């Protein structure tokens, strides 16, 4: 991580599920706390898989967090003594989180966000792509494909052990029983319009 000469910037940590995003966010938070910086950690209220008031990684590490229902609530908890603002599972917030993050960085806060850059369909997830484009630093992590062991950049949703349809809801909170990390070649999305179109064109090609 390079050193900023000015205070106030945005760091994005992204990748598939089980790639270590929350673990990396927690590591940066603890490092800031060790340096005697005041850190405020936030998470969407919708994410209560492991704890309602903590960010918990899949390997069990955790840090106390403030659950918020919408991005605008974050500012209510920021004070002049705050140095670092960290937001986990940022993909669950609406696009307004981009404005909140921009304002905080412009005002001199170090902002760290972590989230999925792709949804289970393999498509850009919520505000994360925009946050990546405006960030000073982007760390894209990879997991390990559960099928072949290759680097995994996608998240496979499983319903009763079977790949979920493209038309399933995008937001469905789950943990290891609902999702697996997959590589490009083993990521399955039944009923995907683009893939169905490609298959049809291939079948009709002379």
From Swiss-Prot:
Residues that bind Zn(2+): 145, 148, 183, 186
Which parts of the chain are coiled coil? none
Q: Which GO terms describe its biological process?
A: DNA biosynthetic process; thymidine metabolic process
One Gene Ontology cellular component term attached to this UniProt record is:
cytosol
Residues that, per the record, bind ATP: 15-22, 88-91
Per the record, what are the reactions this protein catalyses? thymidine + ATP = dTMP + ADP + H(+)
The EC code for this enzyme is 2.7.1.21
Q: Which PROSITE patterns match?
A: TK_CELLULAR_TYPE
GO terms of molecular function:
ATP binding; thymidine kinase activity; zinc ion binding
Gene3D superfamilies tied to this protein: 3.30.60.20, P-loop containing nucleotide triphosphate hydrolases
Keywords attached to this Swiss-Prot or TrEMBL record, sorted alphabetically, are: ATP-binding, Cytoplasm, DNA synthesis, Kinase, Metal-binding, Nucleotide-binding, Transferase, Zinc
Show the active-site residues: 89 (proton acceptor)
Q: Which domain of life is it from?
A: Bacteria
Task: Provide the protein's localization.
Answer: Cytoplasm
Spell out the residue ranges making up region: Disordered.
183-206
Enzyme class comes to: transferase
- Family assignment from sequence similarity: Belongs to the thymidine kinase family.
Subunit structure, briefly? Homotetramer.
Q: Which NCBIfam families match?
A: PRK04296.1-1
Q: By what name is this protein known?
A: Thymidine kinase
Species annotation: Anoxybacillus flavithermus (strain DSM 21510 / WK1)
Q: Mind giving the lineage of the organism this protein is from?
A: Bacteria, Bacillati, Bacillota, Bacilli, Bacillales
